[in-house]
């Protein structure tokens, strides 16, 4: 299960949720919740396997990991790692789902993640996510700052295995 809650201009809401079978998200224009189609549900099931990291138990997830080489990113020497995950389905066709991570060779944490955009007006272009401000949470390290050319996100906290009401994941009928 997975849910994203946001605070948008002082209004707290569940932006999207996935209960293990069905996913939904809010329409960015109307802010109304909309159920996703079966293709999006299948993709969500695959994407949920990536949490908290595609590297954690990657073999059991069916992912492959390959060292591509070393590269310098903004003056930092990194290991470039290719991760091949479950395919994404778009318009009934499976498409490769590959990410590249750049791990700092001193601290062994990813500082950049690159992925190809699969749909929309930017389809085929690469999005580069910069990961920083790593903090330890229950023995795992999480980047509390993530930024790309499109958006920046600062996280206040990561809570692992919290008690969560199952209603959080349910599509809000009639709202």
Regions found by a protein language model. Name each.
Residues 10, 55-57, 156:
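Short, functionally important structural connectors and interaction interfaces within domains
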Residues 9-12, 31-33, 119, 150:
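Short, surface-exposed beta-strand-loop junctions and turns on beta-sheet-rich folds
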Residues 74-172:
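Gly/Pro-enriched, hydrophobic low-complexity segments
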Residues 2-6, 24-27, 67, 83, ...:
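Short hydrophobic/aromatic-rich beta-strand segments that constitute the beta-sheet cores
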Residues 1-17:
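PEST-like low-complexity, intrinsically disordered acidic/proline/serine-rich tracts
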Residues 17-93, 120-123, 130, 164, ...:
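Flexible, processing/modification-adjacent segments and terminal tails
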